[in-house]
From Swiss-Prot:
Keyword Plastid listed: no
Subcellular location: Cytoplasm; Golgi apparatus membrane; Golgi apparatus, trans-Golgi network membrane; Endosome membrane
Quaternary structure and interacting proteins, as annotated: Component of the Golgi-associated retrograde protein (GARP) complex, composed by VPS52, VPS53 and VPS54. Interacts directly with VPS52 and VPS54.
Gene name as annotated: VPS53
PANTHER family named among the record's database cross-references: VACUOLAR PROTEIN SORTING-ASSOCIATED PROTEIN 53 HOMOLOG (PTHR12820:SF0), VACUOLAR SORTING PROTEIN 53 (PTHR12820)
Keyword tRNA processing appears in the UniProt entry: no
Coiled-coil features, chain-numbered ranges: 53-152
Protein name: Vacuolar protein sorting-associated protein 53 A
Family from the record: Belongs to the VPS53 family.
């Protein structure tokens, strides 16, 4: 207790002086408590002293107990060791007896088996000498099993002697079997009734011998069977290509006539199968020798007949023996190339096709299961893995060039014929609006593909595919030649075409048919490549590509659509000339729309409905975009070709401009293709708004004309502004102050505009039309001159709308560039 606590305690016990009288009793009480505590402490100390002595005694007792326990454990361990020694002494004698018993048992068993082996070998020797094949086969199996037990005793002289004796017996059996089989096929089987049974029993002996004996016997039999074949067909009379079918008739007749006799062979030997393999190898060698040694080019008919019979024979072998790679039935796929069907018909046809294939596969699996169940392995050589397909026919591959040349000549001649007979029109009610020549062309190609598919799926098919490419390119060139030539205008400048194009209503329909036919050829050529890549050997699949052909047709589509635009431009030239001849400076009042506007409406009303009906939405969209991009700038530039405009004349021209704009905006509904209306309307409004803005500048007062021009044409140029002042009828002296003020404030850009760069109206002779007289030059033109445009259009490989948008963007952007592939093409 600290000092402060003691003071608090005293103050608490004696708060007043009167309470001090209780100090003495309190002191006595405390002293009594102290004495009691001291006595308690002393008692505890004494008790603790007595406890320490007790603990020492207990520890000593525990130590003695541990020592006694350790002594007892040692005694137990010693007794256990003694017991173990006694047990080992007892078991030592028992183990010796056990080993002795085991050795005696093994010796007795070995001696018994040795006795059996000696007896079996002696019996086998007797059976071999008597040619008792059936009994010898069973005995040989037993001897082989007994010999397996003596593998560990190979060095024992008696065992070595027995093995040598057994090998000699096996050689005797082998020689007897081979000797007996040499009489097979000589006619003795009819004289000796038991010969076939003896040979059948000898096959059991061969199975019991080493596998090499069976291989040697089968090979000898096949070689002996084919000896007469070699002698017959190596002679000068039958060693000809036109006698090939007789070779296969010989082996089929041989198998058919000897089918009962050859049943002596176990089914697991697959003797007819092995015979056919050797026959195919020998036939391939002979046929290849005939083809190589031919002095003259083979007649295609004979060559194809020999190849056809060879392929059919290989299919028969593959069907009979199996083991080939499963082939995909592509006849239906070839028929589907270039078909035009709606979705419901297409889905139904696909479903039926795959149901048919599934049923065929199920039937094949069931047949295979049934064959395995019945054990008829002669019909299906399970696990043989030998592919008869191409075993003989592949030797024809290097010599089929005449066939490919004939196919190419036939296809090219047919192409010339169908193009000459083409009416360049489509029957009413046709859904695809495709020229009959394109569908007929692919019909001929499909027939050619079917013919080749039955003959070859390797180099020959690949060479034929190259022929298809050349034929399709030739057709693309003919479509290209059919398009009208020449052209003028902005689109012509952008695409490198010069001269005007005059097209009639029939010409417009023909151009649309060419576009649709080129699109059909583009799509169908891709399907053709896919089908060929599926059926051709995988080594050639990577080379099956129709991208070049598709690019050719894409180029035809691009040029055809641009030609349509150029044709309408040519029709508009007359109306544009009428517009410049209107006396705009002397008009007295604003009336209805001018005659040239009605002329533009007549041109569009006569062409647009037909084009909208015949062209697909994608191509019609491209046509509209190019038409709008052509008419807008042409109309704008044509205003500058006019002479002086009075205020009334400018108001009339503004009314005409709005009428032309309305006419252009009505084109999608006129063509009944409203899906393109939104983007097209925005495009037309943008292009025609420039012409409206120009007329608003012309109508503005003299004192504000510069400000109005700068506001409406931030990119305007001084040259264009000066031309506007001339249209307003200002004299040179009056123009100068306005021009000085305009130049003082400065335009937004100094780049010369298209309208300012246009020459003054003057008669210009038409440029010579585009003409290509050489087909090779035409093909080069398609592949080279329009290659950039074709790639920009991205029409190849099915791309459509996106490609045309890219083409539009590229051509528009190229106008102001001084270099680059597009600019160089435009300047060509």
């Amino acid at each position: 207790m600290d000092k402060s606590s003691a003071l608090e305690y005293i103050n608490q016990m004696f708060p007043t002086e009167a309470s001090l009288t209780g100090v003495e009793p309190l002191m006595q009480k405390i002293q009594g408590e102290i004495r009691r505590v001291d006595a308690s402490i002393l008692s505890a100390v004494r008790q603790q002293s007595n406890s320490g002595t007790k603990a020492k005694e207990d520890l000593a007792d525990a130590t003695r107990a541990v020592e006694e326990l350790s002594h007892k454990i040692q005694e137990i361990k010693s007794k256990a060791e003694q017991s173990e020694a006694m047990v080992q002494e007892i078991c030592r004698d028992i183990k010796k007896l056990d080993f002795a018993k085991k050795n005696i048992t093994t010796t007795i068993t070995a001696l018994h088996r040795l006795t059996m082996l000696v007896s079996a070998v002696e019996q086998l020797q007797v059976m071999a000498s008597k040619r008792q094949y059936k009994e010898a086969a069973a005995q040989l199996e037993a001897v082989n099993q007994l010999c397996n037990h003596f593998e560990a005793y190979r060095d024992v002289p008696k065992i070595t002697e027995l093995r040598e004796k057994l090998n000699n017996i096996k050689q005797i059996l082998k020689s007897h079997v081979f000797s007996d089989f040499s009489s097979l096929g000589t006619g003795k089987e009819t004289e000796e009734t038991n010969l076939l049974q003896k040979l059948s029993d000898s096959c059991l002996v061969v199975d019991a011998l080493e596998p090499s004996v069976r291989e040697e016997l089968v090979n000898n039999f096949c070689s002996r069977e084919l000896t007469s074949y070699e002698q017959i067909f190596e002679g000068a009379e039958l060693a000809k290509l036109d006698k090939t079918e007789r070779r296969y008739a010989w082996i089929k007749r041989r198998i058919r006539t000897n089918e009962e006799i050859w049943k002596i062979f176990p089914a697991s030997w697959h003797v007819p199968y092995r015979l056919c393999i050797q026959f195919c190898k020998q036939t391939r060698k002979q046929v290849e020798s005939i083809l190589v040694n031919m002095k003259e080019k083979p007649v295609v008919a004979i060559l194809l007949l020999a190849l056809q019979s060879t392929v059919e024979f290989e299919k028969e072998l593959e069907k009979k023996f199996g083991g080939g790679v499963p082939t995909k039935d592509i006849e239906d796929d070839i028929e589907e190339i270039g078909t035009w069907e709606d979705n419901s018909q297409n889905i139904s046809k696909i479903r039926k096709k795959y149901e048919k294939k599934f049923a065929a596969s199920q039937e094949t699996e069931e047949n295979g299961f049934q064959q395995e169940k019945t054990g008829n392995k002669d019909l299906s050589v399970t696990g043989a893995g030998f592919n008869f397909r191409g075993m003989i026919s592949s030797c024809f591959e290097p010599h089929l060039t005449p066939y490919i040349e004939l196919e190419e000549k036939t296809l090219m001649d047919d192409l010339e014929k169908i193009v000459q007979e083409e009416s360049w029109d489509v029957e009413d009610g046709s859904q695809n609006n495709v020229l009959s020549s394109s569908t007929q062309l692919f019909s001929n190609i499909k027939k050619s593909l079917k013919r080749c598919n039955t003959l070859s799926k390797n180099q020959t098919l690949f060479n034929l595919f190259k022929v298809f490419q050349r034929v399709l390119k030739a057709y693309a060139t003919k479509l290209f030649f059919k398009l009208p030539k020449g052209g003028t205008g902005i689109v012509a400048a952008a695409t490198g075409m010069d001269g005007q194009i005059k097209v009639s209503e029939r010409d417009e329909r023909v151009i649309c048919y060419i576009v649709n036919s080129a699109e059909y050829c583009h799509k169908t050529s891709g399907e053709l490549a896919e089908n060929v890549s599926e059926i051709i050997d995988p080594h050639y699949a990577d080379g099956v590509d129709m991208s070049e052909v598709q690019d050719e047709f894409s180029a035809v589509i691009t040029k055809a659509l641009v030609t349509l635009v150029l044709g309408l431009e040519t029709k508009f030239d007359t109306e544009m000339a009428v517009m410049t001849r209107v006396p705009w400076s002397t008009l007295e009042s604003v009336g209805d729309q001018s005659g040239y506007v009605n002329g533009i409406n007549t041109v569009l009303s006569g062409s647009i409905p037909v084009l909208g009906k015949l062209l697909t939405p994608v191509y019609f969209q491209f046509f509209l975009d190019k038409l709008a991009s052509s008419l807008g700038p042409r109309f704008y530039a044509n205003i500058f070709r006019c002479k002086q405009l009075s205020e009334t004349g400018a108001q009339q021209m503004l009314l005409d401009t709005q009428a032309v704009k309305s006419i252009l905006l009505e084109i999608p509904s006129l063509a009944r293709q409203t899906s393109t209306a939104a983007s097209y309307s925005k495009f037309v409004s943008r292009e025609m708004s420039r012409a409206e803005a120009l007329l608003k500048v012309i109508l503005s007062p003299i004192d504000s004309v510069a400000d109005t021009y700068r506001a409406l044409f931030p990119e305007g140029t001084p040259m264009e502004f000066q031309r506007i002042l001339e249209l307003k009828g200002l004299k040179k002296a009056d123009q100068q102050s306005i021009l000085d003020d305009f130049n003082k404030h400065g335009p937004g850009f100094t780049q010369q505009s298209v309208a300012a760069a246009m020459p003054q109206p003057m008669p210009t002779p038409p440029a010579p039309p585009l003409a290509i007289t050489n087909p090779a030059t035409a093909a080069g033109f398609i592949a080279n001159s329009e290659d950039v445009l074709t790639r920009a259009a991205a029409l190849g490989r099915g791309a459509a709308s996106t490609g045309f948008k890219k083409f539009i963007a590229l051509t528009e952007a190229a106008k102001d560039r001084k270099d680059g592939p597009l600019r160089r093409l435009f300047n060509a």
